[in-house]
From Swiss-Prot:
Belongs to the SWC3 family. This is SWR1 complex subunit swc3. It comes from Schizosaccharomyces pombe (strain 972 / ATCC 24843). Component of the SWR1 complex which mediates the ATP-dependent exchange of histone H2A for the H2A variant H2A.Z leading to transcriptional regulation of selected genes by chromatin remodeling. One of its GO terms (biological process) is transcription initiation-coupled chromatin remodeling. Residues 1-13 have a biased composition (Polar residues). It is found in: Nucleus; Cytoplasm. GO terms for molecular function: ATP hydrolysis activity. One of its GO terms (cellular component) is cytosol. Residues 1-27, 170-190 are annotated as: Disordered. Component of the SWR1 chromatin-remodeling complex. Keywords: Chromatin regulator, Cytoplasm, Nucleus.
Length: 391
């Protein structure tokens, strides 16, 4: 259940998941703790709920919700040793600190959350640190790393030969010779008759006075806003019919449609992997988080999130990064619950923003996998709060 203020009757709640408290009006408030696992960023603020419901019940609900986030209700735990064993001892994790930001989960705020960038490789050695770009090594890039020649030469002597060998040769650009009027003439020395004459200009002027469409087209072309078709129309009016081929407009590629055939065997394997907590080998790169309330554990940022930017129109700046993702949980009746969850990142730096945008820009195969998991699961069950009047 979410804290969005919509409440109705539900008799399917297990008794072990309810908390009861006596309200001053003599009614009993029953609240299920299952919905507290997945609060959403679109939920109401706590102060909007205080007028309707008991403050103690709301405080306990928010406390339980915060503890569930810290204990792994939303995110997967980052275990580099386990990932190393799953890969057969071939994938190593290299962790680097990015920056801190505020993670918002519904009405909950996790300030000073640390974010790390994890790079997986087959080498146990940390990759090269980025050197300073200077006149000594201006051609450096991450794909073709060439170390400083001074480090390779013995002692403190500067070896100019090694220095020239390290640097890439500077490209030599030769400017093409300027064309002379004779180059455009069929036979040099003879006067060239201009294609645009005074008569054609007068004819175009009279046409523009008669037809306002041509006048508006000329205005757009003079401002540099003319389309290729309008420029060809001007060519036809001044010179005559154009011999150039018509411009071809680029068409958008067809949208990739997700076609999936899911049978019961796929659903059983998906359920067994969740119930047995089977892990997949994580490769390439990840972003992990570390809450200030629980600094001993790191959590993996959801890679299959759908990223959207929240702008503040008054201040004209980017206010938050909103991420929508799915959390899958097994049930006792051999089923999988799909809980759609939304989080927001605030007070972030440009470095963290670029890292999150890089992580969430998944390929079509990633979107296909997430769509398959969503179709193999059921929607989130709704648990609601209800007030019972004593008879």
């Amino acid at each position: 259940m979410s804290l969005n203020g919509t409440f109705s009757h539900n008799n399917g709640l297990p008794s072990g998941e309810r908390e009861e408290s006596e309200t001053p009006g003599g009614s009993t408030s029953i609240i299920s703790s299952s919905f507290l696992l997945q609060p959403r960023a679109s939920d109401s603020r706590p102060d909007a709920l205080e007028g309707k419901y008991d403050k103690n019940v709301l405080a306990r609900a928010l406390k339980k919700s915060r503890d569930s986030c810290l204990n792994g209700a939303l995110f997967e735990k980052f275990l580099p040793e386990e990932n190393y064993k799953l890969s057969g001892g071939t994938v190593f994790s290299h962790v680097r600190y990015i920056d801190t930001a505020t993670l918002c989960v519904g009405p909950l705020r996790f300030e000073d959350t640390k974010f790390y960038f994890v790079h997986y490789s087959n080498s146990p050695i940390e990759p090269f640190a980025k050197p300073n770009i200077s006149y000594v090594n201006p051609q450096w890039n991450e794909l073709d790393y060439r170390p400083d020649s001074q480090k390779l030469s013995p002692g403190k002597e500067k070896n100019t030969l090694d220095l020239k060998h390290c640097l890439l040769p500077s490209p030599e650009y030769k400017a093409p010779p300027a064309k002379k009027p004779e180059d455009y003439e069929a036979s040099p020395g003879e006067p060239v008759e201009p294609l645009i004459t005074d008569a054609s200009l007068q004819r175009l002027k009279s046409r523009a006075n008669e037809d306002p469409t041509i006048f508006n087209i000329l205005k757009r072309i003079s401002k540099g806003l003319g389309t290729p078709e309008q420029c060809m129309l001007l060519h036809n009016e001044l010179i005559g019919p154009s011999t150039f081929p018509l411009p071809k407009r680029a068409k958008k590629p067809p949208r990739k449609r997700i076609t999936l055939s899911i049978n019961q065997q796929d659903k059983d394997e998906f359920f067994d992997s969740l119930i047995n907590n089977k892990k997949e080998v994580r490769r390439h790169f990840d972003i992990v988080m570390e809450f200030s309330d629980a600094p001993d554990t790191k959590w993996i940022f959801p890679r299959e999130s759908v990223l959207s930017h929240v702008f503040n129109t008054d201040k004209k700046k980017l206010e938050a990064l909103s991420l929508l993702f799915h959390v899958y949980r097994p049930t006792e009746d051999r089923n999988v619950i799909d809980v759609k969850t939304e989080i927001k990142i605030r007070d972030f730096t440009p470095t963290l923003r670029s890292a999150i945008e890089l992580l969430t820009s998944g390929t079509h195969a990633d979107r296909l996998l997430s769509e398959k998991r969503r179709r193999m699961s059921n929607l989130e069950p709704k648990y609601y709060m209800q007030f019972h009047e004593q008879t």
